[in-house]
Each structure stands twice: as structure tokens, then as C-alpha cells.
Amino acid sequence: MYQSINKLLLQHQKKYLRYVDTTDYSSENLDLDQFSYFIITINKTDKCILIEQFCYNAEGHIYSIFFKGPTAKHLSSIICHFQQLNTIISTAHAIYLGRELMKSELALVLDQQYIQD
């Protein structure tokens, strides 16, 4: 892949090109947050993404918070704003959530099935 990208660049652009290790990190396990997790689904009829956040309170009881929106950007904004009032998620979990939201939006746009990793 590095060579094919290299062919597309102009000479003055090549000085910015850096080789990136091609290790497959997709198989690494995600450490779940201690106090919450998210289930993402899509509704093709309404063209929206649905998120259910499961949270644990101090006593260990679980409760759900629902989010619904048309795009990954819209939902990310809502969740980030809402997190100020709720449990804080880790950076790794936030990145994972963003990736999954983009996958779900792409599934909506392409009218495909969405499967959460």
C-alpha cells in the first residue's frame, strides 16, 4: 500500500510521507469502562442511528439512556454534552464509539446491515 500511495504523490508531497507500521490492531481487545457500555443499532425505515447506554449506579443497579440521531456527528455531539452530567467514558472507549457510529452511519447510507464489533 505504501508504494501505491507513493506513486500518487507529487515530489514535494513525498517529504511528508511516513511509513506506518502495518500491524493489525483490530484484533486487540477493548477494555470496557467500569460504569457503562453502549449498544448501537440502526433503523433503516427512519434513517436513524439508535444508541442505548447501559450505566451502573453506585449501588450496582443498571439503568439505560437512549440516544437517537441521523448522523454519527450529531450523536457524538449529544453524547459528549450528556457525558458532562453522566459517567465519563475512557478515551479508548470514546474512539471505539466514534468508529462504530461512523460504521453505523455508513450502513444507513449504503442500505447495508450494521453489526457492532
From Swiss-Prot:
Entry GO CC: chloroplast
Subcellular compartments: Plastid, Chloroplast
Key words, A-Z: Chloroplast, Plastid
InterPro entries according to UniProt: PterinBD-DUF4346, UCP037673
Similarity comment: Belongs to the ycf91 family.
Name of the protein described by the UniProt record: Uncharacterized protein ycf91
Species in which this protein is naturally found: Pyropia yezoensis
